[in-house]
Amino acid sequence: MILAAGFSSRMKAFKPLLPVGGKPMVQRCIDLFLDNGITDIVVVTGHYREHIEPVIRDAGACPVFHPGFASGMLGSIQQGIAKIRPGQTGFFLLPTDIPAIRPATVARMIKKFQSDPHRIIMPCFNDMPGHPPLIPCEFKDRILALKESSTLRDLMTAQKDRTVNLKFHDRGILMDADNQDGYRRVESKVRSLDIPDREECLSIVDQELPKKHPIRDHLAQVAMTALKLAHAVSGPVNVDLVIAAALLHDIRRMEKNHAAAGAELLQGLGFNRVAKVVGQHMNIALDPQAPVRETELVYFADKVCNGPHLDLNYHQRFRHCLEKMPWAANSIWKRYENTRHIQARIEACAGQSITDILAD
């Protein structure tokens, strides 16, 4: 159930029809559920219904008009719940001004609900609850019985023992387009949903690494170094992708073949482009005819960071590795040659030396 009945008074424009990522906000919310195989989608309308309802129908959902929409959100929720068909086991509840949620988030909530269909599934980011909750239909009558002075939040707060707080690395569950600033943030977020932002990367790091693990400092240094490289080179470099991949490149450092293990983790979270970069930060296939890309920048930044410190004398470190592990000479030599070639490519592209690029 999607709520789109309000006046959008703080926005000074009708939010559900504002464009987000090239489509109306309400359509993006509808697509979030259609992409997960949910076809029974109700959108509660009120203000501006004559304009929004055709958009809702064209997007594949069913508009339900709430005549008393001016009285507040609870009435709209009750109007939508009354339209839930018998036999349904649960429903999502999403205000239309929260459109920057990843489809993978909804998919995981569905999977959890299927194994535990009598509990409310509440998505959380950094321990903060967000949207959309997935509510068992057995709560339907209780919601319909709520008085006008009550809120759905009151009912759900009273059901803490029947609520599963499910952690996600998805800040979009907290982001609403309630005003112009919020709208701009949501618009920016939607443009790069397949790349975790800095807070989401740190959420992943917190899940995977102990608080004071030394790899954390290395990740931060590699990210800072890769960012400087990205700003120095010209061409089609996605800076957000560079930062995310750098912050996460050693996320599974303690595992055998940690690059592949890290890539597998990130693919499972829906971050395929980041996974591709992380998966190549140890062994990379170079194309000398192509522009310098994100994969090379993260690869090189990793090689010039010795633990938490920038150390441009990677030549000495590779020699030490050869002495320490002569049985791995072929792979070590290949990585060294790749590092040298990438340095030359970056310097040619930037028109300055690596020393100058990475100077404080």
Per-region residue spans from a language model:
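Active-site flanking loop/helix segments enriched in acidic
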Residues: 198-218, 223, 245-251
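N-terminal glycine-rich phosphate-binding loop and ensuing alpha1 helix
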Residues: 1-46, 50
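Conserved donor nucleotide-binding strand/loop of the catalytic core
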Residues: 58-71
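A short, N-terminal amphipathic alpha-helix
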Residues: 25-40, 79-83, 225-232
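Conserved alpha/beta core of the MobA/IspD/sugar-nucleotide pyrophosphorylase nucleotidyltransferase superfamily
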Residues: 147-200
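Divalent metal-dependent catalytic cores for phosphoryl transfer on phosphate-bearing substrates
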Residues: 209, 230-327
